[in-house]
Structure formats: C-alpha cells, structure tokens
Amino acid sequence: MKELKILVVNNYGQFCHLIHRAVRDLDMDTKIIPNTTPIEDILAEEPDGLILSGGPEMDRAGLCFDYVREIDLPILGICLGHQAIALAYGGHVHSGKKGGYAEVEVEVLEEDDILRGLGPKATVWASHADEVAILPEGFIHLARSDICEIEAMRHPTKPIYGVQWHPEVSHTEKGEELLTNFLEICEKY
C-alpha cells in the first residue's frame, strides 16, 4: 500500500495519541489536528482520510459535525467520533447502560469493507458512557453487542464509518486489521 496522509482529529480523548501511533506504525503519514481546525486548512493538507478520535463529551466536539457533512473524504469515527457522525446525520445518542471501559464481545452483522476479517465475533475495548441509540436514516448497521445495539455503522453512500470501540488499543482483538481496512478504503477512494 502506498503511503497515505491521515489526519487524526483530536476530540480530547485519552487514546488520541494511540490512534496517531497505530496509523504511523502502519507506515502512514499522520498528524493530530485540533477539532477546531477550519475545513479549508484540513483540505490544504490534502489528506487521504480523517479519523475522529474519542473524547469525554459532545460539547467539546468542535467542528466534527461540519467535517462529516462537508468534507468529501473517507472518515472513521471512533467512540465519540462515531456518535458525532450519528448526530450529524440525524441519529440519536443516549447514555449507555454500562459506563466506563470494558472488554466487549461484538457480533459483526455485516462484514462491510471496514469490518472485513473481523467477524463473526470480536473482542474489543469500549466505553459505553454514551452510545448511538438510533441510526441516522439510511445508515447501515454493521455490528452489535449485548451491551450496545449499535456498535458499528456506515453511511449508505459515502465512505463514512463509525465504531463505538477503540481499535487503537491493544485490548481490542483485530484492531490493527480494522485500521488497515480503513486505510485500504482511503487508498481506493
């Protein structure tokens, strides 16, 4: 795979630097940017894709809603990034039944490009303090768990994907594969 430029949008989550390192370790050019970076500055970087990191609260999601609606690039939302994608397209987010980080067994419902090779079940590391409760209209439901019905989703026509779990942490089984799948999506786009 050729070297791609991936921008990691910092939503102030504790694992943002791990996302950056995981992408860098896959031999990609990567950079962390604030979630207040103007869209024109992002486009000036000529990235091949964006990853929206997790974060503590939606009030601090900066311009993420604008990014997912207005930037024509592959986007992967992780945890809060996943929730921001849902909200930007009319979905709903609520408090989860189980907050805090824990190991979760995820059932892959549709082995889409982003989840290729992860199914039928995968053990992941996730926080469910907040979670997507209702998919945006037309979005494809990709994975679920006993704790959270919407663990992963994708936009019906754009290369926009969201996962509730953290592929960048070592506790997540096949996390590197998910990130590699995203990079392959970026390369094809």
From Swiss-Prot:
Positions annotated as active site in the UniProt record: C79 (nucleophile), H166, E168
Keywords: ATP-binding, Glutamine amidotransferase, GMP biosynthesis, Ligase, Nucleotide-binding, Purine biosynthesis
Keyword Nucleotide-binding: yes
Bilayer-spanning residue ranges: none
Glutamine amidotransferase type-1 domain span: 5-189
GO cellular component annotations of the record: cytosol
Reactions listed under catalytic activity: XMP + L-glutamine + ATP + H2O = GMP + L-glutamate + AMP + diphosphate + 2 H(+)
EC number: 6.3.5.2
GO MF annotations in UniProt: ATP binding; GMP synthase activity
Pathway linked to the protein: Purine metabolism; GMP biosynthesis; GMP from XMP (L-Gln route): step 1/1
Enzyme class: ligase
Function as written in the Swiss-Prot or TrEMBL entry: Catalyzes the synthesis of GMP from XMP.
Subunit architecture: Heterodimer composed of a glutamine amidotransferase subunit (A) and a GMP-binding subunit (B).
Name of the protein this chain belongs to: GMP synthase [glutamine-hydrolyzing] subunit A
Protein's organism: Methanosarcina barkeri (strain Fusaro / DSM 804)
Lineage: Archaea, Methanobacteriati, Methanobacteriota, Stenosarchaea group, Methanomicrobia
